[in-house]
Amino acid sequence: MSAAAGAAQAAEHHDMLHMVEMDLNFWNIPLFTEYDKYWHIMGLSISPRTMIMTWITMALVLLFAWACTKNQNVRSPGKAQATFEVLWEFLGGQVFSNLGNKLGAAMMPIIVTFFIYIVFANLLGLIPTLSSPTADKNTTFGLALIVVLLIHYHGLKANGVGGHIGHYFQPFKPFVVIHLIEEIARPVTLAFRLYGNIFAGEVLIAVLLGLININAYVFGGFIPSVIWLAFSVFVGFVQAFVFSMLTIAYVSQFAAHEADHH
């Protein structure tokens, strides 16, 4: 396939998905269907769609946190509090077993926040005409950059400058090349893994919902859409868990000696 033919096919698919989004736009908000609209601020191109979805996600996270803590009761916790306690204990088992008590206590709030934010961000795209912030690679690269900063911060704190730099020369000095390649690949793979799974899920959901819209009848569009929506909910949780666990593993790799003292 030539480059021109590939571009034409991509444009055709884009137009089809755009048409589906327009037909499903029961919010009647033009901004939610303008894929190509950007804000240009100080030389930067900013997607208002992604920004608004990010604000909505943050609001949902804050609302969830408020619901979990508004009526704290040790003896008879509410449903939101009980859900959060189960989540905290589950993730806490992973954090403290890999990072130890001291580093685990420092990382625990960050890991839980990562998980909750990514879950809400992933699931937001399952609502027709809305989109997941994590379906934008700029968001996932931003999250990956935070992980990289955490890795080096805790690595320097645990091992000092000399020990942290010396990590790149282990077990032999020539391995520094491999470690540097790994350093570049780590945030790239972390970002694209999350972005690719969520973006692909959104595209397929739009296609399946489009089948309903073009009179494919109940068994032609509705049932596959419901099945894929259920699977997408599962994928949304799994990808949040994978991102959180990889963050734990990467921090543990650079601050390993703290994990030995739990």
Curated annotation (Swiss-Prot):
One of its GO terms (molecular function) is proton-transporting ATP synthase activity, rotational mechanism. Keywords: ATP synthesis, Cell membrane, CF(0), Hydrogen ion transport, Ion transport, Membrane, Transmembrane, Transmembrane helix, Transport. PROSITE patterns: ATPASE_A. GO terms for biological process: proton motive force-driven plasma membrane ATP synthesis. InterPro entries: ATP_syn_F0_a_bact/chloroplast (IPR045082), ATP_synth_F0_asu (IPR000568), ATP_synth_F0_asu_AS (IPR023011), F0_ATP_A_sf (IPR035908). CDD domains: ATP-synt_Fo_a_6 (cd00310). The keyword Ion transport applies. It is a multi-pass membrane protein. It holds the Pfam family ATP-synt_A. It is found in: Cell membrane. Disulfide bonds: none annotated. Its main location: membrane. PANTHER family: ATP SYNTHASE SUBUNIT A, CHLOROPLASTIC (PTHR42823:SF3). This is ATP synthase subunit a. It comes from Desulforamulus reducens (strain ATCC BAA-1160 / DSM 100696 / MI-1). The lineage of its organism: Bacteria, Bacillati, Bacillota, Clostridia, Eubacteriales. The gene is atpB.
